[in-house]
Amino acid sequence: MNKNEVKTYLLKKNTFQNISITKDAIEQILFLINLNSDNIGIRLSIKKSGCAGFRYSMKLLKASELKKEKDEKEVSFFYQNILIYIYSKDIPFLEGIRIDFVKNNINKIFKFYNTKLEKFCGCGESFSIN
């Protein structure tokens, strides 16, 4: 396998409710991926952080960061020409999310929306898990 090839597999039907990404977010993600030829996609995850306990994370994924062999603890799929990697343990918290790229005062930021989560901190940046 050369360094630009990526091993992927499709999720079984009815095991993952697709995420949705707005047009503005897709355009920005593709723009960021194309800034560096080693970028191949994004990794979505949750991290311990914030006053409520967890926050969503999205980072650019480089070909050089991928393991040679497929990791059974993660899934990968394409969404509108964006290669997305998710750790299996994070899937329950990422199912059904909507990612947008919005103007926040003078900045533009990625915003994650999940109607399944019930507890958020006051600023909306973190959430808790029951």
Curated annotation (Swiss-Prot):
Family the UniProt entry places it in: Belongs to the HesB/IscA family.
Record protein name field: Uncharacterized protein BU122
A molecular-function term among this protein's GO annotations: 2 iron, 2 sulfur cluster binding
PROSITE patterns with a match to the protein in the record: HESB
Domain of life: Bacteria
Pfam family, one: Fe-S_biosyn
GO cellular component assignments: cytosol
InterPro entries: Fe-S_cluster_asmbl/transfer, FeS_biogenesis, FeS_cluster_insertion, FeS_cluster_insertion_CS, HesB-like_dom_sf
Gene Ontology biological process terms, A to Z: iron-sulfur cluster assembly
